[in-house]
Amino acid sequence: MIALLQRVTQAQVTVAGEVIARIGPGLVVLVGIERGDGPPQAERLLERLLSYRVFADSKGHMNLSLADVEGALLVVPQFTLAADTGKGTRPSFTPAAPPPLGKQIFEYLFAQAKARYSRCAAGRFGAHMQLSLTNDGPVTFTLQIPPAVQTATTE
């Protein structure tokens, strides 16, 4: 599971001209679900997101977590994060989880986020979205949770 997190002052997601999610100060997290990802990877990512210290303390050091500053969390599915860009001039999306599984894992991640943290919003899996945000800093990090080891299958 791959996450690109950005510290923001505000963000919103629009689908078909309608704003479906909006947050104030907090984190926007673009999430790429890979083959082999499941609930354990979602749990580990969420654990890290809620405790990752990317907000400034009184001395200006990145020492405070999202929960410490009572910021908001906006999670947005983005399968392109799982692309293989190693060869050629066109990305391959083979490493990304198949859409039904990706949706299931993303929805699980968001449900767990809402259960653990009240200030959550989400983009819509499979939708063409417009994401607008004001990056604060800018502060941007990638987090990777390795997928479970897959065994070869014969078809």
Curated annotation (Swiss-Prot):
Pfam families in the record: Tyr_Deacylase (PF02580)
Entry-linked InterPro entries: Daa-tRNA_deacyls_DTD, DTD-like_sf
MF annotations from Gene Ontology: D-tyrosyl-tRNA(Tyr) deacylase activity; Gly-tRNA(Ala) deacylase activity; Ser(Gly)-tRNA(Ala) hydrolase activity; tRNA binding
Subcellular location: Cytoplasm
GO cellular component, one term: cytoplasm
Known EC number: 3.1.1.96
GO biological process: D-amino acid catabolic process
Position of sequence motif Gly-cisPro motif, important for rejection of L-amino acids: 137-138
Enzyme class: hydrolase
Entry keywords, A to Z: Cytoplasm, Hydrolase, RNA-binding, tRNA-binding
Catalytic activity: glycyl-tRNA(Ala) + H2O = tRNA(Ala) + glycine + H(+); a D-aminoacyl-tRNA + H2O = a tRNA + a D-alpha-amino acid + H(+)
Family: Belongs to the DTD family.
Subunit structure comment from the entry: Homodimer.
Recorded domain comment: A Gly-cisPro motif from one monomer fits into the active site of the other monomer to allow specific chiral rejection of L-amino acids.
Primary role: An aminoacyl-tRNA editing enzyme that deacylates mischarged D-aminoacyl-tRNAs. Also deacylates mischarged glycyl-tRNA(Ala), protecting cells against glycine mischarging by AlaRS. Acts via tRNA-based rather than protein-based catalysis; rejects L-amino acids rather than detecting D-amino acids in the active site. By recycling D-aminoacyl-tRNA to D-amino acids and free tRNA molecules, this enzyme counteracts the toxicity associated with the formation of D-aminoacyl-tRNA entities in vivo and helps enforce protein L-homochirality.
The protein's name: D-aminoacyl-tRNA deacylase
Organism: Nitrosococcus oceani (strain ATCC 19707 / BCRC 17464 / JCM 30415 / NCIMB 11848 / C-107)
Taxonomic placement: Bacteria, Pseudomonadati, Pseudomonadota, Gammaproteobacteria, Chromatiales
